């Protein structure tokens, strides 16, 4: 894995552990809802992760973008498909999404380089 991917995954894992130590019942339910919402249903996991990525880009949440990029990569989304996802996110979100698009491409490239 590349540096960006390793740093993000390490920090996320560390802080998820910390959060789980202190989270109250309501927060635990919210986190469980997030997990179960992305499970297979009428839409498959792959589609839900692509939707999550578009929403994350439009909302300009870099951590969320990285998370969904990783999940999309794990679900076998191709670079061609990813480029179309980026187009939709920029169309919906407007030019303010472009800085997040740049970082998303950099992160996606690292994910793809790790395959080789």
Predicted ranges, named:
Residues 36-39, 70, 74, 91:
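General structural signal for alpha-helix termini and helix-helix connectors
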